[in-house]
Amino acid sequence: MSAKEVRFGEDARNKMLKGVNILADAVKVTLGPKGRNVILDKSFGTPTVTKDGVSVAKEIELADKFENMGAQLVKEVASQTNDAAGDGTTTATVLAQAIVVEGLKAVAAGMNPMDLKRGIDKAVAEAVKTLHAISKPCSDSKAIAQVGTISANSDETVGAKIAEAMEKVGKEGVITVEEGQGLEDSLEVVEGMQFDRGYLSPYFINNQQSQQVELENPYILLHDKKIANIRDMLPLLEGVAKSGQPLLIVAEDVEGEALATLVINSMRGIVKVAAVKAPGFGDRRKAMLEDIAILTGGTVISEEVGLTLESVTLDQLGTAKRVTVGKDNTTIIDGSGEKSAIEARVALIRHQIEESSSDYDKEKLQERVAKLAGGVAVIKVGAATEVEMKEKKDRVEDALHATRAAVEEGIVPGGGVALIRAINSIVDLKGDNYDQQVGIDIARRAMEYPLRTIVSNAGSEAAVVLERVKSGKGNDGYDAATGQYVDMVAAGIIDPTKVTRSALQNAASVAGLMITTEAMVSEIPQKEEGHHHDMGGMGGMGGMGMM
């Protein structure tokens, strides 16, 4: 085990504070409509230009281990806020810096760190209540577009595209962001349930122009095992042929004699049929088959529940208005499942999302909700260069998270105004002792900082604007883009309540930990003297890669 360096008290806290300031100062220049860009050097390729706070924070590593600890803790504030609300990372960083700077001053003056933390927590809890009280629901398309616009750094086309996507697939629908081909942003909507499995044989194709299988009002057979023996299916195929309707088979696999017979039947026009593999793997496959069954009003034919292929009747099959099967995708449109059953299934999956701790599982469950509830929209981002494309895609993803947060918890006036209004609720808040009161005052002063930073970045006088906004009421605030005092909500300058709340709570939580730090332990860096010469020899080999 390598030797460790330990620092205590004031010495440790000052080092940590230096790291906090370096990271926060780099991040906070991006805040507001007139926030500046930060250029990030990459070890390969062109540098990245960004106005996204969390992207800047993630790039920062400091050489001094103790300073780096401070920087990493603030980075944690940005990451937590990003994970919870998808935006507000810069606001959270500014708040954390303000609380740490003020808090460490108070500790240096001899205050009790634990009481300071209790005071800060008390003030934040009260402020959060006020944020919820002034929050308004975000239901109409216009408000959604405004939230998207603000989060995408005042890019109105992004806000409009997100609002349009939400309108088409519903607020529960899945909206994904991809890199497009042209210069313009575009929106593609896939209605119904789509899963990423295509036809098992190109001989099923009946629309040569689009190279797809198109089935109108088909029966849908769902089976959780492989189908290799056609004899098991003969009674069912005869029944389907008599009905004159097409058939879609979704099974673990269809192979050998069974697939060959289906292809021949299809080509001769005896039964219009297509076969695809079931989506997903393992338990997820079973769940997705069950989803399709509920959507189409069918039953999954599974030996686990005593059902076999030989005994299947037509009323155990699902039905839909239309099914299209391509090389890689299958889309079921307008399944004839019971609405109440679909809603119950969606509620069940939502409950699983709340219970799940894995981000990957949550994402997959959310996709299943969307496929059952509305559909999938894809926003394709257009840009002239690769660098611009990456930067824009980041912004669109941010804006998308922010709009989801707004739909979830509502909206508050933006531009730092909501926090200024929340200050009023803690003016009369009393701590149990003097040190707690100082903690409450620290939180109160910190809540002014997002507004101060937005105004400073816009090149105006922060103190003057702050006093003017404080003396205002309700939604009155400062539009940094135009330099005017306006009604923030009417002007479309709004933030999701969840973003502001998460930023404040996460900042206070991590800053509280820093204020109450008394010792720091870090490894002493090893001096690697012997290796430099060897590496010099290796350097010559770099030329080999250039040939």
From Swiss-Prot:
<keyword id="KW-0413">Isomerase</keyword>
<dbReference type="Pfam" id="PF00118">
    <property type="entry name" value="Cpn60_TCP1"/>
</dbReference>
<feature type="binding site">
    <location>
        <begin position="30"/>
        <end position="33"/>
    </location>
    <ligand>
        <name>ATP</name>
    </ligand>
</feature>
<dbReference type="InterPro" id="IPR027409">
    <property type="entry name" value="GroEL-like_apical_dom_sf"/>
</dbReference>
<keyword id="KW-0067">ATP-binding</keyword>
<keyword id="KW-0963">Cytoplasm</keyword>
<comment type="function">
    <text>Together with its co-chaperonin GroES, plays an essential role in assisting protein folding. The GroEL-GroES system forms a nano-cage that allows encapsulation of the non-native substrate proteins and provides a physical environment optimized to promote and accelerate protein folding.</text>
</comment>
<dbReference type="InterPro" id="IPR027410">
    <property type="entry name" value="TCP-1-like_intermed_sf"/>
</dbReference>
<feature type="binding site">
    <location>
        <position position="415"/>
    </location>
    <ligand>
        <name>ATP</name>
    </ligand>
</feature>
<feature type="binding site">
    <location>
        <begin position="479"/>
        <end position="481"/>
    </location>
    <ligand>
        <name>ATP</name>
    </ligand>
</feature>
<dbReference type="GO" id="GO:0042026">
    <property type="term" value="P:protein refolding"/>
</dbReference>
<comment type="subunit">
    <text>Forms a cylinder of 14 subunits composed of two heptameric rings stacked back-to-back. Interacts with the co-chaperonin GroES.</text>
</comment>
<dbReference type="GO" id="GO:0016853">
    <property type="term" value="F:isomerase activity"/>
</dbReference>
<keyword id="KW-0143">Chaperone</keyword>
<protein>
    <recommendedName>
        <fullName>Chaperonin GroEL</fullName>
        <ecNumber>5.6.1.7</ecNumber>
    </recommendedName>
</protein>
<dbReference type="GO" id="GO:0051082">
    <property type="term" value="F:unfolded protein binding"/>
</dbReference>
<dbReference type="InterPro" id="IPR002423">
    <property type="entry name" value="Cpn60/GroEL/TCP-1"/>
</dbReference>
<feature type="binding site">
    <location>
        <position position="51"/>
    </location>
    <ligand>
        <name>ATP</name>
    </ligand>
</feature>
<dbReference type="GO" id="GO:0005524">
    <property type="term" value="F:ATP binding"/>
</dbReference>
<keyword id="KW-0547">Nucleotide-binding</keyword>
<dbReference type="InterPro" id="IPR018370">
    <property type="entry name" value="Chaperonin_Cpn60_CS"/>
</dbReference>
<dbReference type="GO" id="GO:0140662">
    <property type="term" value="F:ATP-dependent protein folding chaperone"/>
</dbReference>
<dbReference type="InterPro" id="IPR001844">
    <property type="entry name" value="Cpn60/GroEL"/>
</dbReference>
<feature type="binding site">
    <location>
        <begin position="87"/>
        <end position="91"/>
    </location>
    <ligand>
        <name>ATP</name>
    </ligand>
</feature>
<feature type="binding site">
    <location>
        <position position="495"/>
    </location>
    <ligand>
        <name>ATP</name>
    </ligand>
</feature>
<dbReference type="InterPro" id="IPR027413">
    <property type="entry name" value="GROEL-like_equatorial_sf"/>
</dbReference>
<dbReference type="GO" id="GO:0005737">
    <property type="term" value="C:cytoplasm"/>
</dbReference>
<comment type="similarity">
    <text>Belongs to the chaperonin (HSP60) family.</text>
</comment>
